[in-house]
Amino acid sequence: MEDYYSFEQVSPDRFEESNIEDYDNFEQVSPEREENVMEFPNEAYADLMELFIKHNLNNKTGNAIIKFFDKHSNLSTSPLPKNIEAGRKLMDIMNVQKLPYSKHCILDYKNKEYFVYYRPIKSCIESLLSNPDIIKNFIYKYQFLQSDGETLYSEQYSGNWWKNAEASIRPKAHILSIILYSDATTTDSLGKSSLHPIYISLRNIRTWRRNKEDAKQLLGYLPILSANNEGQTSKFKRLARETFHNSLKFLLDPLFDEDGIDFKINNKNIWFFPRISTVIGDWPEACTFSLTFKSANSNYPCHFCQTHRNDLTSIRKDCIIIRNKENMQEYYNNGSAESIGLEQVYNYFWTIPNIDIYAATVPDRMHHLDLGLFRYQIEYTKELLGKSLEDKMNRRIAIIPRHPGLKIFAKGVQSIA
């Protein structure tokens, strides 16, 4: 996976370094593993791992705590793991009920209860806002940036989205721009156990600071239904989609049930209006959020637009019809959602004001390459840039120093397409 500088492009493995996403599936632990469920060896061990998770510490910090304790405890045998990795591996094969997450039953299906394991979303945001270094790099208001007479768009708070969002709220309030990231993850080498973590961060935080591990919070784990022999049936697939969106409703509703929310920053109450601005995930995950079909072979495979797959190679920009809340909800209400590659399931995000879930999702490079869309995106980009900017980009590419493993498009950006 590539190591990106932008949080918007961060890959799943970057998240997997930070805290507890390697746990076994709460719902799909195999019977033989249930028989061998363990507990932490002692209270000190349990307290350490709870501290590690609660404060979203990285491995380096956790190991420093262990080293400090062992040095000053004067105990012949340390009650702590030799390092944080050992503690995480132990949690891979044990019951994690002691960790500071609550659970809520979201579905009872075929005599089995499915739970959302979660931290309250307000608590996650409060944890971010309690970090003094994050607050130093926290933006409250839209910023209009210019250089040499040209408008600059460097962060979301300098773009039109923020400007328009700010105009829609009370004058003394502030926008709280929320990023959601989720991805179903296999947690064992055999691929038999999986989890569906969901994370939260804030686009109010400058990008370089947001890329650090402590600038994101694990909101919880979404349930993964046991398919057994019905995984391919339309009824089961619909139930899985409904469960996903019901889980999101449970997690996110507390942000939208009031006239904005007060959060304390530097001992002052600041009035915010939360807005979900970005949903990060791969292409199948984007399909789950937007409830479009999860197949590149479906007639309408794009979760952004209503372009038939046979037209992807010849579509003109003026023929593209963008998906949005209004036209997708109309198909749903008419019972014809499937005719446009949409699941006949109510989308939770239709109930949230000021969010277009189809625009909030981000392009996924790998699956777009699989679909063959990338070359057309390059063509559109070239047309938008114009000849002068295309030449300028080519000149910049040409002066990039060569390095082993670094791909340089020596023939210019047009060679990519």
Put a short name on every predicted segment.
Residues M1-A417:
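A structural signal for the principal folded core domain
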